[in-house]
Amino acid sequence: MNQEKLAKLQAQVRIGGKGTARRKKKVVHRTATADDKKLQSSLKKLAVNNIAGIEEVNMIKDDGTVIHFNNPKVQASLSANTFAITGHAEAKPITEMLPGILSQLGADSLTSLRKLAEQFPRQVLDSKTPKPEDIDEEEDDVPDLVENFDEASKNEAN
């Protein structure tokens, strides 16, 4: 028998007795709330405790981006060595988070930050210095002096 046909037959569910029509398996679509409930029940099994008073959580990735949670819900189970952080997450570049994130950086992150700092002034200088072809000499705001105004005022006074 053909392997594809056999796999197709195995994937189908047979309801009823001999001679009944085969029908497809029902696909169960999971929602985010169902996943969240399942996650919370798993966390309850680990006996997690809520940690209050955490204003922000920053997770620094190797590529220089930061996953930033503002006012997250943090739960921890020290016996299982598990921390759960839930809330709205934003992916931001590390340069956007400076200087507030400096105290949170480790040694490896500081070396990557130094490399970023070396590249940053070059980019700023390159963008700020005007190119010679962009400078237009005819756009002087000061007009050329044509007459001598001192002589005109002396003539009016006489």
From Swiss-Prot:
Residue span of region Disordered: 123-158
SMART domains: NAC (SM01407)
Key word Mitochondrion present: no
Domain named NAC-A/B: residues: 33-98
Annotated positions of the N6-methyllysine modification: 5
Record PTM Phosphothreonine, positions in chain: 111
UniProt KW keywords: Methylation, Phosphoprotein
Amino acid composition bias (Acidic residues), ranges on this chain: 134-150
InterPro entries named in the record: BTF3, NAC_A/B_dom_sf, Nas_poly-pep-assoc_cplx_dom
Family that this chain belongs to: Belongs to the NAC-beta family.
Protein known as: Transcription factor BTF3 homolog 4
Organism whose genome encodes this protein: Bos taurus
Lineage of producing organism: Eukaryota, Metazoa, Chordata, Craniata, Vertebrata
Gene (UniProt): BTF3L4
